[in-house]
Amino acid sequence: MLFTSTAVAALSGALLIQPALAAPNGLPSHGGSHHGPKDPFEVLDPQNWVNPDNMTWADFKSPPGTKWNDPSRKGSIRNFNIALVNVDYPDKPFTITMAPGSDVFKNPQPGSPNVTRSQVPAFYRDFLNKPGKLNRGHTLHEYWMEDSNGRFGVDLTTFGVYKMPLKSYQYGIGESMNAGACPIGETCYYEIRDDALGAWRKDIGEEKAKSFELVFILSAGQDESSTWQEFGEIMFQNKEDVTSAFGPPPGNGTGNMTLPNYAKTRYVEWTSWASASAIWPNAGDGSSTQAESSGMGTFAHELSHLLNVGDNYNNPYGKPLRRSYTGPWSMMSRGSFNGPGGPHTRWQVPPLQGGSMGSQHTFHDKIRLGLTTKDSALNISREALANSGLIVARVTARVIAPKPGDLIGIHVAMDKDKSPKCDVNTDPYCDGNGYQNYNVEVIDRMGADSFCPDSGVMLSKTRDKAFSNYQWTIDANPQDIKQVDFHRPDGTPAMISLGDYRQLADALFHAGTRSGSQYEYTDKANNLQFYIIEPHRDEAGVLSYTTAVRYVGGKDPHKRGVKLDKNAKITSSNTKPTDKGVTCSFTLHNTGTYNPAAGKAKHPQDVTAYLKSDVYRLKATVEGRGWRVEVPNALATAEFGKTVTVSVAVGAENSAQDKAKVTLTATSEADPSKFATAECKVNKFRN
């Protein structure tokens, strides 16, 4: 099987830069205020997704209290001992050794360092794995240390440069991907590993070569993954418009001039020959191939393959078309494209923008690869949930190293996926059926996740043993995101396809009402309901969410109950109903009792501590002409025997009646027959 890191790229000059839909930081506001915010109607947890094209290095934020790029700190379990084998060709030197903008792709970029061929091995070793000015201190070692909470690091030893015996395109042109592109009279489809690894082993000896766990082959020039679109349909209106500069080499008596300037490529019918003739990054048998345009996200993605985890992405232009699987949220999906400037800058050398900082691995992949401890996962069973009652748990952002007792994910195992069958050939939103689990995880825009489009909660379905298409993000906003991808040469806008990974930029769930996202998700067929109850961001800046999972239709073992105190208070002190509004604060009591028998339900682990709460749905009404109400959060949770404060925002027009009565109803989600009501009286002239 070919494992590849793929791209949807475009020339920056041809792009329509899209505005972010909200504030650029993507960070939810502090939740849980019980004293009324300055604006009682303020949205608790707004969805502030950001278009990757608009991101800059200013979006990067270090996880609090960390210095994962410290080269003196090694992985507590292992440091990957990796050889970096640098190779160039008779027809293609390393781009970084050339004058700025001098190759056909206008690389290297202005301001690039002046590097000689003999300096190439050290340059790319340092660029990839030594904190410095050019890479802004970001390294492969940093990525894996952060992603694994200090368990795995990277040691990189560099070799070469080795001159390959054949021309670059004889290795780069693939037999199936680029059929018909080999210059007439020449032979292509050669495996770069044979000559690259052969030269390396001959140089250092078999015994020393065997001392390395893995090998990165770094090929001079571009990779096809990062150039096929931008130097294809983005630059040229039609394939016949591709200029000779991007075509095959001039004829030398072998008839090469009969080849067109375009060629077949992986995802669409054509690209320029110059793009098609480059290698496509891939991994297998202990080695991976990359090129100079391959960012650190590509190296991290290919290293993941070498650890025996597969791709989880689609063809964004496939026929039939399918939605992206996990999009920008997963290193094994299009998260490998993440970085400032978005995917359309991945063609640049050196790779300092798109693809330079891929996302973290998902919670599913972290468990699979041993990047986190099992203690940081809450493992529950859907079937046991029917007998134990709902579970409430606080989940911390996956970028944060969990402390003892902290969770970075919830894993809900199912004995069978009961979802109705769907057909991937006719429905682009079909998940393919046959999943074994649901996962809940929190993503925050810091560390390697800084260039994810949003902060919030990701729900996904996963398969245990599948090697590809094994995880499917539940999209909180499944509608077409309707963003322009680029402009064609004639000025026609090309929209992001339904299969484009950026369709999932607004997929995360958020707490509270009016967020632009959703705060709950129900899978009726699988009898599961998920709740996003409240966001929390502590003084250090760590993001977490209180979440809950309930079996729909089970026999709840607990006695449920709820009470609202009658003396609701107006807790806003600096505003009036006719200004920003006021807050009515209600005291909610969980009057239910816990049944110890629930702890005997056969979950994969002891979940007793998470069974001792209920979730309540809040609804508010108001009596009075010209008045309005809103519950900033339609959900609340409280442990058995405990109380919490819940809020209702109340506002009035200047012409409203002088007084109004607000009624709040709180209903148990576990047992809707248990509910309580209380009133709050307000006067538009007083706060």
Curated annotation (Swiss-Prot):
EC number(s) from the headed UniProt entry: 3.4.24.-
Record InterPro entries: Peptidase_M6-like_domain
Main localization of the protein described in the UniProt heading: secreted
Localization: Secreted
Record key words, sorted: Glycoprotein, Hydrolase, Metalloprotease, Protease, Secreted, Signal
Keyword Ligase part of the UniProt annotation: no
Disulphide bridges, residue numbers: none
Gene Ontology MF term list: metallopeptidase activity
Glycosylation (residues): N54, N114, N252, N256, N379
GO BP annotations, alphabetical order: proteolysis
Secretion signal span: 1-22
Single GO cellular component term: extracellular region
Family note: Belongs to the peptidase M10B family.
Name of the protein described by the UniProt record: Putative secreted metallopeptidase
UniProt source species: Arthroderma benhamiae (strain ATCC MYA-4681 / CBS 112371)
Phylogenetic classification of the source organism: Eukaryota, Fungi, Dikarya, Ascomycota, Pezizomycotina
